[in-house]
Amino acid sequence: LHHVLGSVHPHLPQYKERYHHGDLEAFQRTYFEHLALAAESGLFDTIGHPDLIKNIEPEAYDLSRLMGTICETLDRIAATGTAMELNTSGLNKVVPEMNPGPEMLRQMREREIPVVIGADAHQPERVAGDFDQGLERLREAGYSMVSNFLDRQRIDLPIDAAQASLESQQV
């Protein structure tokens, strides 16, 4: 077993039935609370697509109102040493940006939270999809390293080395 990814899926009917009681902002805050609890459980190496909630009723997703909750969540995740995912499949979602978006990614960098890039590759053609853009987003946020896992041990690679590896695979 190389890597255990923990994700909260707020779009699933079971999750919505249990946690959405009419107050969308409270539902969003609960989602971030669950991300922190997942990291604190110690079960996961990485927390996946950490702002996926923005795709549920995106017109009601107000980052400025949620930033305090998000920062508290990131503080808790950082304290565990758990990595977080930059998920490139967000480019194909209702809110067409990676998960997390740029501001949350910058906040992760400020807390020195390691990042793994993922593509939610449910189809073979999506494997490593948009990883080049993901590496660029990491650079823009101030990261110089990207992480992956082998035998559940995190390995940090320079972004330039990861980029070179991607380019060599495209030949």
Per-range role (PLM):
Residues 1-80, 162-171:
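Extended substrate/RNA-proximal surfaces in nucleic-acid metabolism proteins
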Residues 61-171:
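Charged catalytic cores and adjacent phosphate/nucleic-acid-binding surfaces used
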